[in-house]
Amino acid sequence: MEVDGAEPARRRSTRATRGRHSKYEEAVEEPGKVKSDKKDPKTSDKNPKTTKLKTPTKAKTTTRSKARKKSKNDEEGVVRCPCGATEDDPSDGKIMIECEDCLEWQHSQCVLQTNDLEQVPDHYVCNECTEKKTQEKETTEAQEESEDKGKGEEEKDSNDKDEKYDSTYVPNNETAEKEPVARVSKSTHKRVGHIDDITEKVRKSAASALKGIFVSVPTSKYSPGAGVSPEQFCETLALTIEQELYDAYGTVEPEIGSNYRDKFRTLSFNLRDSKNETLRIRVMTGQVTPQTLVAMSSEEMMNPELQKLAEEVRAEAIRDTVLVVDEAPRLRRTHKGEEIVGEYEEYIDNVDQALKMERQRDGDGKEAAESRNQIERAVRDIEGANGEADSKTSNSPKESSNSPIVPKWKRDIDLAQGESDHEHDHDHNSDHEDKVNGILGDVSREAREAETDDWTTISEAPFVWTGTVPMAGLDKTSCAAFSLGSSSVHFNPNVSWGSVFYASKPLTIEGRLDKSKADPYLSKVLGAGTRDVAAFCLLPSDSSESDREAYYKLYEYFHSRSKYGVIHNRSTLVKDAYLIPLAPDDAPPYTLGSLVKPSVELSSLKRSRPLLVALYIVGKLSPKRGAAVSVESHVASSEKHPPKRQSMRDRVKQNAGNAGNASRRASDARKSTPPVTATPVTPAAPTLVAPVNAPVGPAPVVPPYAGFQGGVYGAPVGIQRVPGAPMGVPGVPIAPAGMPGVPVAPLGMHGAPAHHMAQSGTPIAPAAHPRKPTGAPPPDLDALKTLLNDPNLRNAPAAPAQNDLLQNPALLMSIIDQAKKR
């Protein structure tokens, strides 16, 4: 309707065919090729609620139903509604929808019984178009039946109708979304006799390529048939294969489809392969039909070489996915050590069987003997690993020092206890030994006894230090040091090590030196005679696995590089200190061969495990530097009652306790000494001094060469020599001049400078200076003698200098006895 007096306005449309009328479209134009124009964004913004659009993602065509409100300006498109309306009336407010096939507009209320825009479907086809499609479908089915009966005329009519159907039918978007690739039946396309008759460009190119492949095959490989030329045969075969390919993978679209193209590339590649002549011959001789060829997979069409390679790759992948079952016993590492998991008996049976087969095959030759020795050692190690476990429990084997995983050097230093425990375990392990010893012989006990020789010899020597050996990049190693001796006769391994290095600090490794440079240097220093050498052996101090592994890693680090470690912990008396690794078969260095009275001689050892030796180059040792305090009675007592064998850990604890006891005894001795006072005396004629402990007045200053102020390892004050007295005669410890009241040592005598000495060794004071006793109680001489006989006191570190009296214990004891008699 038009409003009087107003200029008619243009109708707005959101259809894809905006600006064109359907009656002007040519009948020969294929709607499938018409692409949708982009909507005007301005128009969409002005009327956003008049259209419900849903953009398809897969369909090639963009035709879809449109629903809009009638407007006054709508003048394009055909209106055909069941209500009889032929024009759009915007004033009634009804929504109109367009058929996607005939492009005619109808009221939504009339055909769908709803005026709600949300309920309008995305794709709409009117009733007339639906009936038309139903009739065409029935006609197609009838044509298929007629084709099966072999009626040529009906087949021709059917093909004509199919061509007409293809040129007019456009699938709606709903169908395109559900089935993006439409399959084509054999009856919907006319078969051609020549390649030139094919109208689709893609199909024509595919058929021509297949023909070229078959033409290149020599005619001697196949038989074209009677009255048929090779070229005609190849063309017919190519057309047949292409038709099967199109029927299986083609679509109704002119673009044919991606599946068709991909399959054709696979066929062309495998048929052109120069190594795949077998496939070409099979196709041309009819062994492989065109339908079978199209259905074959890519791997089935490969040449034999590629098929074999693919089979090998598949088999390799299968092998990688299968877990390999290990027949050897597994080891579980726990906080208690390593435990064998699995059936031990079954494993022993397998080893026995392998051993018998090995003997039968190799005989008694040298190679056979070596092979048997290897197997015997493996079984012996496993047997030893289970010996201790079976003695404790028959169900869960425990760790043993002879485990095949743990190297032979990883064993406790507590050899005395370990040997007895091992013998006890060996008795309980007789069942396993009876089974294995029949073949192997009883060799495990001899091997174990040989292994304990070296460690027993070293561990029984007196140790001089325990601590850690840290090095950058490696774990700290807990070790104990056993003295190997020195090149000086004045070196006492019990006390002299305190002047070589600091026992309270670790033996830090600060560098390394090449062995080829270190050995000549050490030989030169020792040959010059200006310095002495002292050495001790380092062994792991704990039985834990971590300490043993750290010890072995430290050894392996230097031995594998043929280098010596440079030790940082050394006193000012030491010029150089090195850590030397010694393999079981290495001869001791020349430097170590010059040691005097070593506690352990390396040349006599049958070493079966690596060792670490610390070597110190010290200044020339004098009697005062290297001598040690010793009491003959204690030595005799030690020889008469030798100490029991102890483990390293027990010996460390015992010596720590002895050192504390010595300190406490010295403190008690100081407390028990009575205080005395110094009384000046007048000069008098020389007289024999009766009491040996009488206090005296101020003493003259003693020159440095005459003696020293020192103590007997914890005594209150030192012993001073009487000025002018002959060497070897002790004097009375005195207090400094002007300091009365300082307690004197409970031993010795003092007098003025004497000009003569009695034969008995008693100093004679001048006549003008008689002695007067002060009345102080005499000291406890028995306690002093007991203190001097204490072995811990004797083994304590020496003072910087020593009195001659301390080097003559017999004289010291005789003086004490004389004092007691008086």
Curated annotation (Swiss-Prot):
Residues 11-21, 49-71 have a biased composition (Basic residues). Keywords: Metal-binding, Nucleus, Repressor, Transcription, Transcription regulation, Zinc, Zinc-finger. One of its GO terms (molecular function) is zinc ion binding. It is found in: Nucleus. It comes from the Eukaryota. Pfam families: PHD_5, SPOC, TFIIS_M. Residues 22-48, 148-166, 359-383, 637-653 have a biased composition (Basic and acidic residues). A zinc finger (PHD-type) spans 78-132. Residues 1-93, 132-189, 359-409, 417-436, 632-682, 755-778 are annotated as: Disordered. GO terms for biological process: DNA-templated transcription; regulation of transcription by RNA polymerase II. GO terms for cellular component: nucleus. Residues 392-404 have a biased composition (Polar residues). Residues 655-664, 673-682 have a biased composition (Low complexity). Residues 198-323 form the TFIIS central domain. Signal peptide: none annotated. Negative regulator of transcription elongation. Belongs to the BYE1 family. This is Transcription factor BYE1. It comes from Yarrowia lipolytica (strain CLIB 122 / E 150).
